[in-house]
Amino acid sequence: MRRDPEDYVEHVLSIVEQVPRGQVTSYGAIAAAVGGGPRQVGAVMSRHGGPVPWWRVVRADGSLPPSHEDGARPHYLEEGTPLRASGAVDMVRAFWDPLE
């Protein structure tokens, strides 16, 4: 069964909007919730993620693409998102699972 691309985009963005302040989820976790793969979720975020809290979606290791790190850091500090010494998000403490 083929999925409507607009519905897929809306579903991804809806999940991103549910991530609580101070927490993050991963591209893969969103993909597990909506179907598809992490790269598809990344493509949606790249094209349509501006209006949602995009900084709450990170790689599975807690890192962001280098081009987003500087923009995300103020949000993490404001929201009290747990960070590791490396600057990546502490996924043990900050991960939010959209399937729970």
Question: Where are the predicted features?
Answer:
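Nucleic acid-binding interface residues in structured DNA/RNA-binding domains
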Residues: 1-100
